[in-house]
């Protein structure tokens, strides 16, 4: 009851990002490919199709009901980025740089804001991967890291090197940092 974790991807990733700004019930959370700033994402396109992203905020998934100029407060209130200071839950974020559905700068914005405020957070990016990692080695890596993350926060297991020290960009794919620190 006191060791609850939560995970979601895409729309679910947004829901996790939003949820942790409203409650501290979760001991750890993973947010995959989240939209965290509906105002900046509104003006974007889906990179793989070139379609406008505006419709999804106005009438489909987000159901805001109109444009940011008609309902600025709704866009503001539904964008987790503006409530980062209220997040107390450790967060693992996965957002890939070839994501054609959700602009990956949304994940970067989220991560950089969390780190700026000293919040425990990690960003995983699988270079060249789209909305969800399709290469088996990336899926395996993601599952290992997600399990280590939740095991650390929910079961009190030792922290792995990648969470404690990070992995320098030049060592990506060479040194995984899976080793647990005693």
Language model features with spans:
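Active-site-proximal cap/loop segments of hydrolase catalytic domains
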Residues: 1-182
């Amino acid at each position: 009851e006191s060791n609850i974790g939560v995970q979601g991807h895409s729309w679910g990733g947004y829901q996790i990002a939003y949820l942790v700004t409203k409650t501290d019930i979760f001991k750890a959370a993973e947010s995959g490919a989240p939209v965290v700033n509906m105002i900046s994402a509104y003006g974007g396109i889906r990179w793989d199709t070139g379609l406008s992203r505006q419709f999804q905020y106005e009438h489909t998934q987000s159901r805001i009901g109109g444009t940011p100029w008609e309902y600025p407060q709704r866009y503001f209130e539904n964008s987790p980025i503006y409530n980062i200071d209220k997040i107390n839950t450790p967060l693992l974020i996965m957002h890939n740089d070839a994501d054609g559905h959700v602009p990956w700068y949304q994940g970067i914005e989220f991560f950089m804001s969390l780190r700026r405020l000293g919040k425990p957070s990690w960003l995983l990016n699988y270079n060249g991967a789209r909305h969800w990692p399709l290469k088996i080695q990336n899926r395996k890596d993601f599952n290992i890291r997600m399990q280590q993350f939740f095991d650390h926060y929910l079961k009190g297991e030792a922290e792995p090197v990648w969470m404690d020290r990070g992995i320098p960009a030049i060592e990506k794919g060479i040194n995984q940092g899976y080793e647990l620190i005693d």
